[in-house]
A protein has these predicted regions:
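Carbohydrate-interacting/catalytic domains
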Residues: 1-165
């Protein structure tokens, strides 16, 4: 992800594409072993003027629209054991199983076309309905009698599926 050294006109300038930032933040914020860190301009946006080759350059760093939702998802759902579904080069998923007081979630992301994963959550999740907490997908997903369902994600996007209350 970007930081004060990698933003525009800085020594290590290396821009991360805007579409990819929510995917990276989903990994940083929702996986069990990641160290959560958020770059201030990604949360609040930033605008500044700097000098490049004796010319003033106006820099605008838009906020990552999904970031508040991902932070909220971390607080509410990113608990318990992690089960990875890293079986495709462009579409991955992981399940956070939850704990005694947090229900867990299914996180699925694609860096290419629309993707899906068939995931069995267990009989304790049988006949349940799931919604995308980030609202990138609008359908509801129902699990079968074994707690299995197909979870989908939009092209170049991330979805955090949680049990509907």
């Amino acid at each position: 992800m970007e930081n004060h050294d990698t933003q525009q006109l800085q020594a290590l300038e290396s821009a991360v594409k805007d579409w990819f930032k929510p995917l990276a933040y989903a990994i940083i914020l929702l996986t069990d072993e990641a160290y959560p860190c958020v770059f201030y301009p990604d949360l609040f946006g930033a605008e500044y003027i700097d000098i490049k080759e004796d010319q003033e350059v106006h820099i605008i760093m838009p906020k990552v629209e999904e970031l508040p939702g991902l932070l909220e998802a971390r607080k509410l759902f990113a608990y318990g054991k992690q089960i990875d579904y890293f079986d495709h080069p462009n579409c991955i998923a992981f399940v956070r199983t939850g704990d005694e007081t947090h229900p867990g979630c299914v996180v699925i992301m694609s860096n290419s076309e629309e993707g899906y994963k068939e995931i069995e959550l267990g009989k304790e999740h049988a006949d349940s309905v799931y919604i995308d907490f980030l609202k990138n997908r609008h359908e509801e997903i129902s699990t079968d009698q074994n707690g299995k369902a197909v979870f989908r994600v939009n092209p170049g996007s991330v979805s955090v599926w949680v049990r509907k209350q």
